[in-house]
Amino acid sequence: MLEERIMPIKRELIEYATLVENMVEKVIKGLMEKEKSYPLEVIEKDEPRTDRYELELDEKCVWILAQFQPMAVDLRTILMMLEMNRDLERIGDLSSTMSRSAIFLIERPQVKPYIDIPRMSDIVQSMIRDSVNAFIENDSQLAREVFQRDKTVNALRDQIIRELLTFMSSDPTTIERSFDLISLALDLERIGDHSTNICEDVVFMVEGEVIKHMDDKNKDKDRK
């Protein structure tokens, strides 16, 4: 009976994750193709959908908690779905913020070729997808692999910031555009962090190990 209530929520979480992953993709597609319609669609159509998902999923999870008072594994599953719902909502919010930066940049000459931003986006999209897959499949090993990708995202963020600081110091006319590019990189990095939040919960649910606040070396170690 309880499993029959949980499975539809899992399916909705997959749909929700696909939506926010596509939002990230649209923002970067618009930036690369200099086409404002993509980020505008994220703001005008997709963001309201994420808000509806977040509210509906929250209500369903709270209803299950109240009606069934689940214990042990079922309780951890419901609590994790609530946490995942909030992480996906934040990813949607960050995608909308990125859309505004992208529109600003589309309307102006490029500071530099966009190479690392789309690379970051591709990795972050895979992190969103695999974090949810790890939850659905109870795959803690996949969750730990996502931690490794987060290191790459952080390195790309740092590289982008270093390059743009150089541009700004040599040509002050690039400052405003450079700041928006830095904002994009920081938002992508935060989206990666929300994906790792989900993976931390997966590891706890599957292995019973709390890895929040651990350093990266301990997070991605193999279980003995």
Where are these regions (language model features)?
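Cytosolic, long alpha-helical scaffolding segments
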Residues: 1-224
